[in-house]
Amino acid sequence: MMAPPSQVQGRLSSSMNKSLALLTVTLLLGGCQSLIHKTPDGTPPVEDTAVETKAKPEKYGSFSEDSLYSLLVAELAGQRNRFDIALSNYVVQAQKTRDPGVSERAFRIAEYLGADQEALDTSLLWARSAPDNLDAQRAAAIQLARAGRYEESMVYMEKVLNGQGDTHFDFLALSAAETDPDTRAGLLQSFDHLLKKYPNNGQLLFGKALLLQQDGRPDEALTLLEDNSASRHEVAPLLLRSRLLQSMKRSDEALPLLKAGIKEHPDDKRVRLAYARLLVEQNRLDDAKAEFAGLVQQFPDDDDLRFSLALVCLEAQAWDEARIYLEELVERDSHVDAAHFNLGRLAEEQKDTARALDEYAQVGPGNDFLPAQLRQTDVLLKAGRVDEAAQRLDKARSEQPDYAIQLYLIEAEALSNNDQQEKAWQAIQEGLKQYPEDLNLLYTRSMLAEKRNDLAQMEKDLRFVIAREPDNAMALNALGYTLADRTTRYGEARELILKAHKLNPDDPAILDSMGWINYRQGKLADAERYLRQALQRYPDHEVAAHLGEVLWAQGRQGDARAIWREYLDKQPDSDVLRRTIKRLTGAETP
């Protein structure tokens, strides 16, 4: 155990003081490797402030014995993984000594630990105590940008620019993505100010283009990049130009741009990946498959690429190839759950029920667990194995209690979708015994109650949800629509739907409800307007049934029949459409 400062002071001679000072300086210079670069899990942390230019070595000043002792304790604490003590001591000493080396060390520790405020404070101390150190100025600029202090960040970034260092104007611009328009406008002015001094600086031009993109001005951003001959062939501006073209519905121009970029940068993964993804977006699946296969061949250790290739193969219905890549992922112990889930999907496509169930059963907790449980349940129910489905879900709830509520929801939904309404009701009731006030379970029970014509229970559950979450647009809309459709309480229905619409004005389901309440109240023109908006956003057979009914009520039977015919061709098993057509025309078909 280390002696307290008073005892240490009593034992130190002047020569020992010098030795201790040398030891501490050695620790300060070398400790960064032991504390920062050798992380607890053995992996080096990402260093945001890394640069190509070599900084001048910091000169350490003379420290008091108390400071030396505090710094030694910090280093020993770091070696024992007590990073909280190491950070605290270094921050205090950085503030006390104003020494560039101590400030840098404090900053590196804070950055590694994700201590944002300490990283900001110590980066500023470092930058002020080492005005000629470009690393320090860049660190301060980045931390200020992270803190939303963009104008101050620009000041420090300009110092880096003046020193011909590697700037991060792109990071500064990206960090402002979620800011308000006034802040972006001010930042754009700062960029323009610097561009007057450095009109051909590619980093500045790229940063400004990013800001213009975020400001909803893609045409100006694209023009800026295309007019900048100095950086138009660099990878980052090239990728931004591609994204801008796609956002402007000019993907046909983006493809040749990226293809030319591949020729210019054949070893750059980002360009080839952007090209492959754009091929997928344009539904050129065979070309995309070939491009992803080339990427996997070029970067054989990149399992993210291998997984993307497998998904493209699935989309292209290249089943055998998809299986090969998915099984490779399992063998490589990478994307294992996602691989099993997609192997299950593949088996379903090939009508191999046993293989599908086996693959879904191997998906562990994580992003693919619930989708796998849902598919497994659906497969069993379609095969008539209702009891087995219930047993598997019960076992899953027992083994993974954190997923219990979602598993009750899956069980009820799957049973309801497979015309097992009574069993769905029993499942949701069992869930509510365990979790009586869970809003998702209550909402689901309300939907099942409506199918059972138990409107009182439906309204009770939805009122409970709304009381707990007054701005729950889904619950407001569900209750409002049901009151409009199943009762004559149109005033209440309208109030609920209007509130939902105010909360979520572009939601197709809410727009459908707006159309329906207007129809119920005889406002046919408004009804048609809302229903057409809903159908444009979500081409759905139920919305088409509603729109056709409104057109029929307007005396536009031909238009109504055309809508019904179009959507009946798309979904011939739609009960809603067929009931509407039968009720209004007396015929089975329009």
Curated annotation (Swiss-Prot):
Listed name of the protein: TPR repeat-containing protein PA4667
Stretch forming the signal peptide: none
PROSITE patterns according to UniProt: TPR, TPR_REGION
SUPFAM superfamilies to which the protein is assigned, alphabetical: TPR-like
UniProt xrefs under Pfam families: TPR_16, TPR_19
Keywords recorded for this protein, A-Z: Repeat, TPR repeat
TPR repeat spans: 235-268, 269-302, 370-403, 405-438, 508-541
Lineage of the organism: Bacteria, Pseudomonadati, Pseudomonadota, Gammaproteobacteria, Pseudomonadales
Keyword flag Repeat: yes
SMART domains the record matches: TPR (SM00028)
